[in-house]
Amino acid sequence: MIDLSPLARRLAGTPLAEWANTLQVQLDKKMEKGHGDLERWQSALDALPKIQPTEVDLLDGLKLDTNCDDETRAQMRTALMGLSPWRKGPFDLFGVHVDTEWRSDWKWSRVSPHLDLKGKRILDVGCGNGYYMWRMLGAGADSVIGVDPNWLFFCQFQAVQRYLSEPNAWHLPFPFEDLPPNLEGFDTVFSMGVFYHRRSPIEHLLALKDCLVKGGELVLETLVVEGDKHQVLVPEDRYAQMRNVWFLPSVPALELWLRRAGFTDVRCVDVSMTTVDEQRGTEWMKYQSLSDFLDPDDHSKTIEGLPAPMRAVIVAKK
């Protein structure tokens, strides 16, 4: 059982207190339903060695370490490999380098210089395995709550969390839609790599805004295309082999949508092409990756002939 009472205590006296007191029941019900692979992943978690870090670095990466022997490291590696595939990272856990599909540290280095997270209460929507949540804590956040319905990501988060005492980060295996409306309790809300999967992009922006306190900050990272404020790509079918991609606006169009949704001080702080060095297959993620989704003769296009992935980071205030 995952005990959420520390989260309820952390949020006592905040606008999120009432919601926090409902989460244990909601999580327990979700755990009862379970998932077909949950038992296998739980076995991997149970196989993790029972050691404590003497070195913790969440600021310059994600590294936990202590003096341990080769046998312990081998046990750690086998258990972590049992939670494959690992998408977001990398993680350095007691001498085991988890070389994830994504170099998420590169994205964080593009995003974090534009943010002040010290003392902030943060919501990370579509948090994956929680890599960015740990980096947010490293940047001084007061507390971070991530929501993502993927059970494997939930278990990967638990693998790291068990080695950190009172980490002030919680992964809830819920879809964003399960959050109640008008929470208005977070200083900063992140939505990274989620927006283009939404069929109703403006509704997503409004829902994100409802989670923020007045004056709070949204950090939105999503796929974009070149063009003016009227330019939006809607794929006919797949985009980079993904079926669930709906809207890829230009940066000016996205900024317009944010203003229309009621955000102010809207600014684009980064635009970057996604390269096959940043997203690729590894021994920790052995399935297809970006190189398989691009035109083999022209990496400026996807395999469908559409513009290759380009990502923008937009920051805006409520």
Swiss-Prot record:
| UniProt keywords, alphabetically | Transferase, tRNA processing
Provide an example Pfam family for this protein. Answer: Methyltransf_9
Report residues binding carboxy-S-adenosyl-L-methionine: 88, 102, 107, 126, 192, 196, 311
Q: According to the UniProt entry, what is the EC number of this protein?
A: 2.5.1.-
Quickly give the catalysed reaction: carboxy-S-adenosyl-L-methionine + 5-hydroxyuridine(34) in tRNA = 5-carboxymethoxyuridine(34) in tRNA + S-adenosyl-L-homocysteine + H(+)
Q: Which InterPro entries match?
A: CmoB (IPR010017), Mo5U34_MeTrfas-like (IPR027555), SAM-dependent_MTases_sf (IPR029063)
- Gene Ontology terms, MF aspect: methyltransferase activity; transferase activity, transferring alkyl or aryl (other than methyl) groups
The source's superkingdom equals Bacteria
CDD domains to which the protein is assigned, alphabetical = AdoMet_MTases
| EC class name | transferase
| Keyword Transferase recorded | yes
Q: Which GO terms describe its biological process?
A: tRNA wobble uridine modification
User: Gene3D superfamilies of this UniProt entry?
Assistant: Vaccinia Virus protein VP39
Quaternary state and interactors: Homotetramer.
PANTHER family noted in UniProt? METHYLTRANSFERASE, TRNA U34 CARBOXYMETHYLTRANSFERASE
The record's similarity note reads: Belongs to the class I-like SAM-binding methyltransferase superfamily. CmoB family.
Summarizing the function annotation, the protein's role is: Catalyzes carboxymethyl transfer from carboxy-S-adenosyl-L-methionine (Cx-SAM) to 5-hydroxyuridine (ho5U) to form 5-carboxymethoxyuridine (cmo5U) at position 34 in tRNAs.
Could you tell me what this protein is called?
tRNA U34 carboxymethyltransferase
Task: Give the gene that encodes this protein.
Answer: cmoB
